[in-house]
Amino acid sequence: AIEARVKAIADDPRVRKALETAEEQVPFAIEEQIALSEIPAPTFHEEERAAELIKRLRAYGLTEITKDAMGNVLARRPGSGTGPAIALAAHMDTVFPAGTDCTVRREGERYIGPGIGDNASGLRNLLQILRSLQAANIETEGDLWFIGSVQEEGEGDICGAKALVKNGI
């Protein structure tokens, strides 16, 4: 039964369109990842990266975007209301201290820079998923929440994510 459901989803032309869009947009997504990575975001100082994330979420069609008291970014993509909500989250901060040169450089097929993998890659994935869903006009049964959390690294002690859980998201 589950296999048949997965096959039906995979065979849906909208899902194929979303996957094709994601593949086609890899070069753009990499540039987006670099741009996000080059915004300094040491733990407790994620504001500038959060502002850029909000700007991009709006550009990709989301209108219900808020920041909670901790500074977490929460963006809702409404579903039809017939299914459970799903949260997709990535933390915005990096382990690198204030003053670190965040320039990303390319060496062959590799991109090297503070926070390019941890966690500009997670933010890139959130945005790439959103763009792909929008391009394919996929309506989900439940709401999708795109979340940029704060204070994950080091002394941040995942406080942003803890606040999300405590507050019911």
Language model features with spans:
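Acidic/His- and Gly-rich active-site-bordering loop/insert found
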Residues: 4-110
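Acidic/histidine-rich catalytic neighborhood of metal-dependent amide-processing enzymes
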Residues: 110, 115-169
